[in-house]
Amino acid sequence: MPQAIVALVGKPNVGKSTLFNRLSLREKSIVHDLPGITRDRKYAKANLFSDLIVVDTPGLEFAAAGSLEFNMMQQSLVAINEAHIICFVVDAITGILPIDEECANLIRKHNKQSSTILVINKTEKPIILDKSYYKLGFSESVCISAKHGQGIYELGDIIQNILSEDKKINFLTTTNTKCEYNQQRPELELAIVGRPNCGKSTFINAILNEDRVLTGPQSGLTRNSVEIDWEYYGHLIRLVDTAGVRKKNAVTQSCELLSVNDTFKTIRFANIVVVMIDATRGLEQQDLSIISYAVNEGRGIVLVVNKWDLIKKKKEFQKELSRLIAYSVFQIKGINPIYISAKEKFNLESVLQQCVLTYASWQKRVTTGTLNQWLAKAMSNSPLPFQSHGKRVKIKYCTQTKARPPTIKLFCNNIESIDESYKRYLINNFKLNFDIAAGVPVRLSFVKGKNPYR
């Protein structure tokens, strides 16, 4: 069924993100007292009301072309242009300021077809609307408190009335399919993570072939995780751009801490994590920490080295990187980094292909019979050690208990006698035998006992 797009627009710090979270019933946008936290458009299904997509936008600030504030405003203008309904959010505490009047004029200029609702936020206490609110020129208005949920259903009633009465709204003319949340759950949740300024947002813009998220030389431009639904050769993919992750002791501002926590939350909910490394800085401890976290969460890993066009001694770089990976993260032993230049759009297709292949491996299942045939052969090629009293350790049976990632339960007579090196042997042999991508962690669970099926 077609979905209407409702854009939340206004100057910084009027409560757009709080309202966005309230309408979507999920804390998808970071809320902070510091202005300018939201820098990209964020879309979500409005769970309070059926068939609506709600859009959070950066605060409108009028600045010189090329500045961060100007680029943020361009993001807001995209939302204004594509919206069926605009919720123009103002702050009841500050009242109407000249910047609010400028915002109202901007909305009228860039979207003459849509209906606009004046949403007066932060009205925890009753207020009397003076003429400055009416001078903005919008016929529909509602007082709310996004923080406490007051007036939200009244806002919903106004939206539903506009949708049912306004004949100018034609959902079938909506062309921006990237912004709409597909009713079908995305097949693949793909998170792009890494240190600040390694090129995550540039990579996403390059594969989408549009300036979807903010980019620039400044470190830390992305603060919220930004979700974008996108189709790749029949695969419905949710791309998630994330805030860069610095070392813990380097994070001093509370807003950055919220951004980092949001990134780690994104990793936990992703299927595949593209860990992006800045080639000009090489593999650092923070990259390894991100990889280890994603592996421990059971996510599939695709390792990408960006800014490859800036490296002169390429063979030496590749050799050293392979050595560091093999030494540091055994769970993804043998992973082949993909070398790209997001800026030059070099080798991006290889990343997407590897993501799809890794996803297939990540959710792979092996029948119990085939699994036990593999186990017998693996133990025959490399027998388990003897116990102290001369009896050989035996793994009697195994079964796959889950996929995403593959998890194998093994029944044996002495768990303590199976050392880490033999566990690594089994994992590597399993991956090799069943063509599991190197970036997929495989989990082994050892249980003391007999074959439960005998």
Curated annotation (Swiss-Prot):
Entry keyword set: GTP-binding, Nucleotide-binding, Repeat, Ribosome biogenesis
GO biological process: ribosome biogenesis
Organism for this UniProt entry: Orientia tsutsugamushi (strain Ikeda)
Chain sites annotated for binding GTP 1: 10-17, 56-60, 121-124
Ligand binding (GTP 2): 194-201, 241-245, 306-309
HAMAP family to which the protein is assigned, alphabetical: GTPase_Der (MF_00195)
Assembly: Associates with the 50S ribosomal subunit.
Homology family: Belongs to the TRAFAC class TrmE-Era-EngA-EngB-Septin-like GTPase superfamily. EngA (Der) GTPase family.
Occurrences of domain KH-like (ranges): 364-450
Residue ranges constituting the EngA-type G domain according to the UniProt record: 4-167, 188-363
GO molecular function: GTP binding
Protein name: GTPase Der
One Pfam family linked to the record: MMR_HSR1
Function statement: GTPase that plays an essential role in the late steps of ribosome biogenesis.
